[in-house]
């Protein structure tokens, strides 16, 4: 698998997990819908091969979750998000 496929797989796993999440807060649920839209935009950029080299940066998925305690408390979700951002930062410095 190439870097594009691996990265797309990680983002797809995040989306799949989001679909299984049961949250108590309506505000968090609404935010998660927007978050998923952003993840979908990233997947499209990967599929179109228009995603930029990371140059050591991250996609911001960790930051997008860190403001919501309910999302941070979900260990599986946190692991998926940090795994993706770390992979992009470290492995996708050039495609």
Task: List PLM regions with ranges.
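Short terminal alpha-helical segments
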Residues: 1-31, 85, 89-92
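Residue-level detector of solvent-exposed, low-hydrophobicity positions
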Residues: 11, 24, 38, 42-45, ...
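Amphipathic alpha-helical binding modules
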Residues: 57-95
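Amphipathic alpha-helical interaction modules
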Residues: 15-64
């Amino acid at each position: 698998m190439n870097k594009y496929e691996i990265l797309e797989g990680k983002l797809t796993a995040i989306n799949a997990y989001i679909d299984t999440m049961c949250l108590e807060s309506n505000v968090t649920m609404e935010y998660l819908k927007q978050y998923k839209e952003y993840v979908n935009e990233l997947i499209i950029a990967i599929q179109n091969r228009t995603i930029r080299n990371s140059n050591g940066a991250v996609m911001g998925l960790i930051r997008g979750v860190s403001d919501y305690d309910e999302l941070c408390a979900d260990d599986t979700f946190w692991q998926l998000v940090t795994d993706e951002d770390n992979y992009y930062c470290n492995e996708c410095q050039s495609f």
